[in-house]
């Protein structure tokens, strides 16, 4: 499915999958992709977030407030 993605995009999706597992979720949602973008740290998305002074810790705190962990 990800063969048409760039290496960086595949890395973000891999990190998003790790985040989904951390939340004990059986899906990859936008919240996981957002965390993956920030965690990857070097893509356009990560750089935009850095310029807005948004880091992984801040994003994780806000995601955890909004998203419940799975069973």
Give the role of each language-model region:
Residues 1-71:
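Histone-fold recognition with a strong bias for associated Lys/Arg-rich disordered tails
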């Amino acid at each position: 499915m990800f063969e048409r993605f760039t290496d960086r995009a595949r890395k973000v999706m891999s990190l998003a999958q790790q985040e989904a597992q951390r939340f004990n979720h059986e899906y990859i949602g936008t919240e996981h992709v957002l965390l993956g973008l920030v965690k990857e740290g070097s893509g356009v998305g990560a750089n935009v977030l850095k310029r807005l002074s948004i880091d992984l810790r801040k994003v994780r705190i806000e995601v955890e407030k909004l998203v419940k962990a799975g069973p």
